[in-house]
């Protein structure tokens, strides 16, 4: 709403080095409110079904008109809304419809700030098959922003070679911000959101978890992969590659320093050894046993090929001398279960093959673990004390994380036990 626009302007004017801003679409103003992006998707769905979408579109238009009126803006918002409405009515694709939330918000913010507006479709490029074209995008973005003029670039979307609009996945404005940061060789990428950085654990499971002041990109990748969701995980790659630190900040608490993400975070804040804990439920573990498996050439490839042929990617691959376990998403695996198992049996002739469903995978992540003896012992002792049965263990050679598998029923208590062992 207009109040958030004013907060954004205050933040931008606090530091003249803030020259580029990437807005997302308006979110919820209150608990039962609709996000503008959801309303735009609804318009597309209603139009595709032959239903009248105008009432939904009127809700969207009213949101933007209210903001423009309260801020006294001069941009021709009516013409922009009419263009969007006409294209939805003409059958524009879902990506075009969804992207207009950021586009319209960008027009308003540029007018409010007195900054230049640049349509992201001019520089954020995808290949014909829908893959993000990072290098072409970086070249175009760097060229267009080379004059140093303060610019608003709407997030979330870009375009195919033919100009058709293509979006990133939800939360993709984070990615656009990282793209712009890389293109202008920024000293820091500030990602302003509604939380003051990352927490060491999910506050829905651990009451009032400690804040994370600094974290490395590698640590964040581990935590994001396992479910931590403050920043879109794909937003890390452009700035990580360029060595640009990211600062997660809170729009509603701008004085809070937030969390700094960098290539090499300082080691003076390693207490309490771990950086964070994250996990996900709903995995299936396929355990394949065969005597002398380790001496059979191509055994692992044959097993994984059965999953690949059925478009099921594996999450983890713990192994023993005569045992190979494949951890996959239970939801993705379930409809293809029989055909995959039959394929594995046909190709490898195992002694036994067993499937364990309803498994949770929990990652304990921290650059400090490599410097501290007995980290794994503390972790497993805490789980044992809490009466939790460890179903799977996986630790990489980098010692950046320890991954454990437990029954879904033990998910919350496992995170609580690990947190209490290292933090409390």
Residue ranges and their predicted role:
Residues 257-424:
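A conserved regulatory-domain signal marking ACT and ACT-like small-molecule sensing domains
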Residues 117-119, 248, 316, 392:
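A structural preference for short, hydrophobic beta-strand core positions in alpha/beta folds
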Residues 45, 69, 244-247, 345, ...:
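Non-catalytic alpha-helical coupling and interface elements of nucleotide-dependent molecular machines
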Residues 1-232, 236, 329, 405-407:
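Nucleotide/pyrophosphate-binding catalytic subdomain
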